[in-house]
C-alpha cells in the first residue's frame, strides 16, 4: 500500500509475474481491497488516497476461489493499515458569505470560531455588500444558516462548494474514534 498524492481515491496495480496468482483471481483481489477500504478502518469512514499493489501470492488448485482471494486481500489490508499510520480526514468547503459591510467583523469572528480560515474580503462601495471568502470544515457548518441570519439580522447569505480534504485535528479525531468505538 502506498499513498496517492494526485487526488485519486483508489488505485490498484497488478505486479504479479509468472502466474503466482492466476489472472482470473486478480479482479477478486482488487475488489477485496476496494471493499475493505470503502468500509473504513478508522471510525468507519472510507479510506481514500490509497494505492494497493499486488506483488505476490499463491494459488492452490483445490482451495483457491474468488472469495478466498477477496478475504485474503481484506485481511492483508487490515494487517498493514496500522503500520501505515493513517489519519482521519474531513471535507473542507470554500465558503462565500455576502452581507452588509457592518456585519463583516462578526461574520469573520464566527467563521474563525468554526475552525475556518478567512482568505479575504471584498467590499463593494456601490452596493454596501461585502463578500468574505473562507475555507471551513463541513462539520462546523451544520447550523450556519441560522447563525448567519442571527449575526446579520437576516441580511446575509452564503454559498459553499467542496474544496479538499484535510486532517482532522488530533483532539477531534480522538473524540470521533472514541464515539465510533462505543457504537460498535
Language-model segments: residues:
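Accessory interaction regions appended to the cores of large information-processing enzymes
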Residues: 1-184
Amino acid at each position: 500500500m502506498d499513498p496517492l498524492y494526485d487526488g485519486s481515491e483508489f488505485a490498484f496495480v497488478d505486479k504479479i509475474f509468472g502466474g503466482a496468482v492466476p489472472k482470473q483471481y486478480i479482479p477478486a483481489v482488487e475488489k477485496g481491497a476496494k471493499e475493505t477500504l470503502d468500509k473504513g478502518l478508522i471510525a468507519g469512514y472510507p479510506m481514500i488516497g490509497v494505492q494497493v499493489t499486488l506483488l505476490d501470492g499463491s494459488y492452490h488448485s483445490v482451495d483457491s476461489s474468488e472469495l478466498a482471494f477477496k478475504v485474503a486481500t481484506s485481511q492483508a489490508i487490515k494487517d498493514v493499515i496500522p503500520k501505515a499510520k493513517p489519519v482521519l480526514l474531513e471535507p473542507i468547503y470554500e465558503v462565500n458569505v455576502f452581507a452588509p459591510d457592518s456585519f463583516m467583523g462578526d461574520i469573520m469572528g464566527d467563521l474563525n470560531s468554526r475552525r475556518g480560515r478567512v482568505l479575504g474580503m471584498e467590499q463593494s462601495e456601490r452596493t454596501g455588500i461585502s463578500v468574505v471568502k473562507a475555507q471551513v470544515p463541513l462539520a462546523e457548518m451544520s447550523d450556519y444558516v441560522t447563525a448567519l441570519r442571527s449575526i446579520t439580522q437576516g441580511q446575509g447569505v452564503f454559498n459553499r462548494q467542496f474544496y479538499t480534504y484535510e486532517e482532522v485535528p488530533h483532539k477531534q479525531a480522538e473524540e470521533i474514534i472514541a464515539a465510533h468505538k462505543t457504537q460498535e
